[in-house]
């Protein structure tokens, strides 16, 4: 779990920005979105092959 220590006199906006950057880096938000609903294995396989085709097209 990422945490940010806010120093005295440090703006809250900066601390929130740092926290958001840490969350993005660890991929917490992405995994929580993927676990939000159940995806059938066939749907996962189709999405994976579509992403691979998109990657190969570069």
Swiss-Prot record:
Single biological process term from Gene Ontology: translation
Signal sequence bounds: none
Pfam families given in the database record: Ribosomal_S21
Keyword flag Ribonucleoprotein: yes
GO MF annotations in UniProt: structural constituent of ribosome
Keywords: Ribonucleoprotein, Ribosomal protein
Compositional bias of kind Basic residues: 43-58
InterPro entries named among the record's database cross-references: Ribosomal_bS21, Ribosomal_bS21_sf
Family as reported in the entry's similarity comment: Belongs to the bacterial ribosomal protein bS21 family.
Record-given protein name: Small ribosomal subunit protein bS21
Lineage: Bacteria, Pseudomonadati, Chlamydiota, Chlamydiia, Chlamydiales
């Amino acid at each position: 779990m990422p945490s940010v220590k806010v120093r005295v006199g440090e703006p809250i906006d900066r601390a929130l920005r740092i926290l958001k950057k840490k969350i993005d880096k660890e991929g917490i938000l992405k995994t929580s979105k993927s676990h939000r609903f159940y995806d059938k294995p066939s749907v996962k396989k189709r999405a994976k092959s579509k992403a691979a085709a998109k990657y190969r097209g570069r």
